[in-house]
Structures are given as structure tokens and as C-alpha cells.
Swiss-Prot record:
Belongs to the DDA1 family. GO terms for cellular component: Cul4-RING E3 ubiquitin ligase complex. Component of numerous DCX (DDB1-CUL4-X-box) E3 ubiquitin-protein ligase complexes which consist of a core of DDB1, cullin-4 (CUL4A or CUL4B), DDA1 and RBX1. Residues 67-77 have a biased composition (Basic and acidic residues). Pathway: Protein modification; protein ubiquitination. Residues 67-104 are annotated as: Disordered. This is DET1- and DDB1-associated protein 1. It comes from Danio rerio (Zebrafish). The keyword Amino-acid biosynthesis does not apply. GO terms for biological process: positive regulation of proteasomal ubiquitin-dependent protein catabolic process; protein polyubiquitination. Functions as a component of numerous distinct DCX (DDB1-CUL4-X-box) E3 ubiquitin-protein ligase complexes which mediate the ubiquitination and subsequent proteasomal degradation of target proteins. In the DCX complexes, acts as a scaffolding subunit required to stabilize the complex.
Length: 104
């Protein structure tokens, strides 16, 4: 099949785009050797590389938030220690579950 016959039925806006096509000018395989990574350090073969599942942006924002709030946490802990009585625990034991166990 000739190139002209192959390209004949294709819809085009400008036919001169295909008139300059030459198969010889298409990328030729070069004789250059491909670049290869050569490690500078020797790593153990049993080393396992694990990728983080969280997004880089989310991880960065969490780190910034932790840095920002670390000072606030320290201030609260110091204030509680100086005040004498520690704050009550945030979680309170459920009393209804004990009552349910007594009924059965």
C-alpha cells in the first residue's frame, strides 16, 4: 500500500501537512547508549521500600498543624500542672451497660 493511498481518505483541514511526509525522516534509532542509574551506595537487598499512602500535601498540612498546636498543648499541660487539680477525663464510663449486665 502506498503512503498516498493510505492517507487519501483521511479528513484534513490542510492537505499540505501530509504532502511533506517522508518515511525516512521519521525518528531513527540512534546508536547512543541509554542512560543508566549507577548507585553510589550499597543498600541491603532485603530492604523493603514502602510508599506513604497519604497525599504529600495532606501530610505537610498535618505536620504544620502539629507544629502550630504543639505549643498550645504544652501551655495547657503546664497550666493544669500548676493549677493543682487535673481536669476530669474526657471519657466517662457508661453506667447503663453495667445496669444491663445486672438485669440478665
Amino acid at each position: 500500500m502506498d503512503k498516498a493511498d493510505f492517507l487519501k481518505g483521511l479528513p484534513v483541514y490542510n492537505k499540505t501537512n501530509f504532502s511533506r511526509f517522508h518515511a525516512d525522516s521519521v525518528c531513527k534509532a540512534s546508536n547512543r547508549r541509554p542512560s543508566v542509574y549507577l548507585p553510589t551506595r550499597e543498600y541491603p537487598s532485603e530492604q523493603i521500600i514502602v510508599t506513604e499512602k497519604t497525599n504529600i500535601l495532606l501530610r505537610y498540612l498535618h505536620q504544620q498543624w502539629d507544629k502550630k498546636n504543639a505549643a498550645k498543648k504544652r501551655e495547657q499541660e503546664q497550666a493544669e500542672g500548676e493549677g493543682g487539680s487535673p481536669a476530669p477525663p474526657r471519657k466517662i464510663a457508661r453506667t447503663d451497660s453495667q445496669e444491663m449486665n445486672e438485669d440478665s
